[in-house]
Amino acid sequence: MAKLALAATSGKSCKILLGLRLLAFSATLSAAIVMGLNKETETFVVGKVGNTPIKATFTAKFDHTPAFVFFVVANAMVSFHNLLMIALQIFGGKMEFTGFRLLSVAILDMLNVTLISAAANAAAFMAEVGKNGNKHARWDKICDRFATYCDHGAGALIAAFAGVILMLIISAASISRLAQQNKCCSTTASPSVVP
């Protein structure tokens, strides 16, 4: 009876989990792509010799900042994880997701929550420095000069934090499925008699 109830709720929860994974995949992949392609080149007047301006061309790219490189790599890894889990959920219908498999999926989901959270927070810190600078460290702000670069970075951060929230929900659902499976197995097991 308990297995029948678990199977009935399992079909609906699998569809919801699949939808959440698709959304998380989309959010993290778009964050990785937007930040990975984030580049802006501007020419500025840096001085004058007489009446002739001296110009220099500067480029702002994501790979100039290690935190943004980590952000792109982490979002790509979480996207790949979600893609594998989606494929496993769609094409692995004949596989039984019990025991070690559910545990490994739950652990991988938690690791990916940690990874994407760390990457999004590191990138948010660097975005804050880029927007406002740091007078104590004498770091100048750049968003007043590279507005498009900063706007694209902000969009990538929004997508990444949406991915963090979705991965938290997915991780909670994975743990819930694991707990349900353990509860179902413990209620169907015959009680042992201790003399």
From Swiss-Prot:
PANTHER family: CASP-LIKE PROTEIN 1U1
InterPro entries, alphabetized: CASP/CASPL, CASP_dom, CASPL
Keywords: Cell membrane, Membrane, Transmembrane, Transmembrane helix
Subcellular location: Cell membrane
Protein name (record): CASP-like protein 1B1
Recorded topology in the membrane: Multi-pass membrane protein
Family classification: Belongs to the Casparian strip membrane proteins (CASP) family.
Cytoplasmic-side segments: 1-15, 89-104, 176-195
GO cellular component: plasma membrane
Listed NCBIfam families: A_tha_TIGR01569
Extracellular compartment residues: 37-67, 126-154
Subunit note: Homodimer and heterodimers.
Superkingdom, natural source: Eukaryota
Spans through the membrane: 16-36, 68-88, 105-125, 155-175
